[in-house]
Amino acid sequence: MQFDSVPVTRAEQNCSILWCPVTHAAAVIDPGGDLDRIECFLEWEQLRLELVLVTHAHPDHAGGAARLATATGARLEGPHRGDEHLVRSLAEQGRRYRLPADDFTPDRWLQDGDEVRFGREALKVLHCPGHSQGHVAYFHPGRRHAFVGDILFRHAIGAWEHADGNLGELVRSIREKLFTLGDDVSFTPGHGETSTFGHERLHNPFIGDEALARWRADRLL
């Protein structure tokens, strides 16, 4: 599998474009907007879009998913059904944040452990609630790379201080679903630079091993 990222929307959200080098079939993760950039990349690389994937239903990540799938005939899959109320209110969210967005019904709601396929490639689905109830991440075992949306960032973690967020679930998603994939696994976050899970375990001031040990010690004092 090959992949690259295109920044979209004023939030500079990392829209990831993945493709099978044998069949040139492609998948796009989180087309939040600026579809012309995404379509130009696909055309430049001579790729055929088969699959549109969504990590969670916030407008900077999912706002353009329906339009891209309709324009290309690609399947639209994800997120987990826990985000159904957000999927149904994307247009309203978009108006609130001044980001163009359309509601949609996915061709498939995703569950933990599912596989999504394009060309000869497959990604494993990990249900990772915490930033939203239906948030999912995608993992390619062969490339040892994950696409984690807004759960984890380089030296930071996703926001949880809103109606659909939950800090405990966020911590469990990162520590039990992502970090257990292995220290060598690299990841593309929803915003900012790539990193590895091993680096974040050592250096992330919010969720790293030392940070978690301090937090647990403070609770015992």
Tell me what each language-model feature is.
Residues M1-E45, A137-G149:
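Conserved beta-strand hairpin/beta-sheet module of binuclear metal-dependent hydrolase folds
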Residues V6-V8, L99-P100, T105-D107, H127-P129:
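Short Gly/Pro-enriched turn/cap motifs at secondary-structure boundaries
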Residues L18, T55, C128:
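Conserved S/T- and glycine-rich ATP-binding loop of Class I adenylate-forming
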Residues T23, G33-R117, E121, L202-R214:
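Active-site HxH/HxHxD metal-binding segment of metal-dependent hydrolases
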Residues A27-I29, L51-L53, V125-H127:
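Short catalytic-loop micro-motif centered on adjacent basic/acidic residues
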Residues I29, E77-G78, V148, P189:
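Hydrophobic residues in well-ordered beta-strands that form the structural core
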Residues A91-Q93, E115, E121-H127, S132-L221:
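Metallo-beta-lactamase
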